[in-house]
Amino acid sequence: AQKWTTQTEIIKSIVLDEWQTITFDFKNDTFLKFNESSPDPVNRTDLNRVLIQINGEDNNAKVTAYIDDFLYDGTISDGNDNNGVDPVFDQLVWSDEFNGTGAIDNGKWFQQTRPIINGFDWANGEIQHYTNRTDNSYVSNGTLKILAKKETYTSYEVYTSGVTKGYTSARLNSKYAFTYGKVEIKAKMPFGVGTFPALWMLGQNITETGGYWAATHGTTGWPDCGEVDIIEHWGNNQDFVQSAMHNRSSFGGTVNKGGRSINNASTEFHIYTLDWNSNKMTFSVDGIVHYVYNPEDKNIQNWPYNAPQYLLFNVAILPNIASNFTQSAMEIDYVRVYQSNTLNTKDILANSFKVYPNPASSEINI
C-alpha cells in the first residue's frame, strides 16, 4: 500500500492574525482514517511520527505561520522501561537476496566446519559433518539451499586420521554482526523427523573454536555470550516452529521459549522475524507474534543482548533421523537486517524543534 494509506488525520480550525492555542488529543479527538479498514489509532502501534500541516484556502499563496511553543503533555520513554515506545527499524543495512548461481557469497558468509566439542562432535547429539562443499550449500533459482544428505563422509578438520560420519550438511556464519534491529528471513524448512534446521544468532564475542569471529572477538564462552534462536524446526510435529533464548540464567533445557504451528512449514515459504531493541526481543511468523522475551530485571545473567550478534543458518541431523532419509534442504529466499529507527527517543528528549522548509510557505514538519 502507499504510505499515505496508513495515515490518520485530525483537522483543527485556525484563525488568522491572532495567537491561539491548538490542542491535539490523540486519544479522544475525532479523526479521519485514510484507510477505513485500518484499526483506530489508539489500537495501533505502527504510527511513528506526527506531521502538522497548515493549509490556507489557496495553497499557492505564501503564508507565514508562527509557532511560539510546542508542548507534549505526557511521558516519553527513554527505551529503558517496559512501557516505552518500541523503535521502528525501517532502514535496510545488510541483506542477501541469494540471486546468484553456485557457491555462496564468501564476502557475506563463512562456512563453519570444525566440530566444537572435543574436535569431534556438535551440540544436541548431532551426527552430521558440516562441510564447505557446494554439495551442501549453494545458490540457485533465487534461493540459498542448505542441503542435508545421507552419505559417508570423512572429515580431517581436527584429526589427521579422519573422522567418518554418515551425514553431511552446512553451517553458515554471517560476516556481519550488529546490535539491535529487525531481522527478516523468508525460508522454507526441510522435510523429515530428525532434521534440525535453525535460523539463529550468537554473540560476536563467543570463544567457539572454528567460528568466524572467535579469533578476532572471542572473549566469552557459551551461554554467557547469549544465543537467540530466531526459529528452530524439529520433532514429530513438522508444522511446529519455535523461538528460544539461551543465556547464563537459562540454557540447555530451553526454559525461555515460545512457538506455534504453521501450515506447510516444509512446502511453503514463511517470513520469520525478530525485532530486537534494548528492552525486549519479539518473535513472529508471517507477522503474527508467538513469543516475547522481556525480563523485568535485566542483568548480566539474563540480558547479554546489548552487544553485537551474528547470524547462523544450519541444518543438523539428530540421532532419530529416519532410516529411509536421503536428503532434504532448507531454502532461504532472503535475509534482511534493518536498523535506524524513525522514532528516536533521544532526539525527542533533546527537545529539538525543526521546521522544513524555512521560511515556511505552506507546510511545517515537526
Predicted regions and their residues:
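Surface-exposed, proline-anchored Ser/Thr-rich loop/turn motifs
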Residues: 346-366
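GH16 jelly-roll
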Residues: 17, 53-56, 72-342
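Noncatalytic modules at the cell exterior or secretory-pathway interfaces
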Residues: 44-51
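Hydrophobic pocket-lining residues within nucleotide cofactor-binding pockets
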Residues: 29, 103, 360
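Short, exposed beta-strand/loop patches in secreted or surface proteins that constitute
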Residues: 12-13, 134-139, 355-357
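Extracellular ligand-binding interfaces
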Residues: 1-38, 46, 57-66, 71-73, ...
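Cysteine-rich, disulfide-stabilized extracellular repeat modules
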Residues: 10, 66, 94, 309, ...
